[in-house]
Amino acid sequence: MIIMVTEVDVLVIGAGPAGSTAAKHAALGGADVLLIDKKSEIGAPKRCAEGVSIGGLESLGIEPNPRWITKKLDGVRMVSPNGTDVWLTSDKVELPEAGYILERKVFDKFMAMDAARAGSRIMVKTIATGMERTDDGYLVSAECMGEKFEIKARIVIAADGPESRVARWAGLNTATRPKDMESAAQFEMVGVEMEDNNCIEFYFGSVAPGGYALDIPEGDDIANVGLGVLSTETDKSAYEHLLEFVESCPATRNAQPVELNIGGDPVGGMPKKLVADSLMVVGDAAGQVNPLTGGGIISGMKGGMLAGQVAAAAVSEGDVTARRLGEYERLCREEIGDEISKYLKVKEYLLTLSDSELDSIAEAFQDVEFEKVSTTELVKKLIKVSPKALLKLGKLF
């Protein structure tokens, strides 16, 4: 049997936002790029909905497109276990991290289209089944529609999600410990009665052990209703907690599900190594996720952009060693890693709080004046109202 061999400068495995961004910037840098994804349709099945900040999109040079935006947010409502709520809306405070709710299926596909327009080739329903080191890169075994073939690449970029097989094949340990893997479950629901359809709602405490629950408005009476939990904090599955939350939350008590999504988020920060000879790891595969919010689209895409730029330069220079690719890791630590490390400390602190302590913080927030609201500003206010938080987090913020 004759095995076809395709040769490329850069092979990106996984066409999520991080992988597509890596492919785009490697192609813009002049590299011959191939982007492969195991799914027959990029973006499907839908990942859990997520918000992105306007500033985050701008930093990546991405113009908002109404095709992949379901809602522009005007604020947040945070609800403690006893129902005490804190409203932070754009009519009262500045929201520098305000942004959009994405239609992930469409957004992911559009990011892949951007990669194609930049010059990257794309193959769908194509799975990498193994790879071996060569003198100047990797030989990757792949399969598409039952046809086996090989791809010879100077650089492989692993964007294949949490528990990356590609990184493992290259000898990198990117495995996520159970205590750092958040299990998530989400319904898209109709008949949701939110207090403000332009605000995202967060619910904290034992409703979602180790994480939080949220209602994300999409329009009219439609919302994504989901939560994330840590298996080390509960004996129940994320789905079981979701069913309980839907029954207990006034906004969703009379709503009906039309779609269910299940997934996982690595919330333990980036692994010690992101590169090896001829290999870089990006996105969820690299733990480029905010441990506090579980959001990883913008941070993963920033990682993808840096990886693509470094890959193109390395190929052009004829040096694809780990030392040369280490520029990507250094830039990631500077531009993404410091923030991830800070928010990991905040998450670890929040895990120590009981429901009654969360209620006390929410009640203290009732008397706090906010001029602007961002994740960092919220933590700073938390430090002001909680002596325990000051002791644990004061030096970080």
Curated annotation (Swiss-Prot):
Its EC number is 1.3.-.-. Pfam families: FAD_binding_2, GGR_cat. Keywords: FAD, Flavoprotein, Lipid biosynthesis, Lipid metabolism, Oxidoreductase, Phospholipid biosynthesis, Phospholipid metabolism. GO terms for molecular function: flavin adenine dinucleotide binding; geranylgeranyl reductase activity; oxidoreductase activity, acting on the CH-CH group of donors, NAD or NADP as acceptor. FAD binds at A18, D37, C48, A49, G51, R104, A128, D284, G296, I297. Pathway: Membrane lipid metabolism; glycerophospholipid metabolism. GO terms for biological process: glycerophospholipid biosynthetic process; membrane lipid biosynthetic process. GO terms for cellular component: membrane. Its cofactor is FAD. This is Digeranylgeranylglycerophospholipid reductase 1. It comes from Methanothermobacter thermautotrophicus (strain ATCC 29096 / DSM 1053 / JCM 10044 / NBRC 100330 / Delta H) (Methanobacterium thermoautotrophicum).
